[in-house]
Amino acid sequence: MSARAYAGLAAAGLAALTVLSPAQAASNATKDEAIAMVKKAVAYIKDQGADKAYPEISSRNGQFIDRDLYIVVYQLDGVVLAHGGNAKFVGKDMKEMKDVDGKLFVKERIELAQKQPSFWQDYKFANPVDKKIEPKQMYCERLENTAVCGGIYKN
């Protein structure tokens, strides 16, 4: 096979992979998967302690990221302690953060966590897979003075 033909086949193969990648990215995470991931994170934090667990939760290559599902840990004052979707949020007070509809979703989340041991919350957020703003449901469990959360995208 000539170098030119080989290059053409390689380019076609690369194009096919690019076209197939979104479809092969697998489906979005489910509610059951979100609950299981949050419970796994809570157990990991209890077992390993925050100093070891939070960096693992925030790691892009860690065990707490699966497709569009990742874990976020908030202090009950709104400060992010760990964030699997964007480590730049760690250490920041996010309680004034609004979604595209103007909802103060972090403030609402920490208020819910102060009242309930676990809950689901609806808001809109950028999907890490396709970067589009989508309806999202976040499942959270209170752990001492924190909320450990993992969410699913509904589209």
What are these regions (language model features)?
Residues S2-N155:
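N-terminal membrane-sensor/transducer module of prokaryotic signaling receptors
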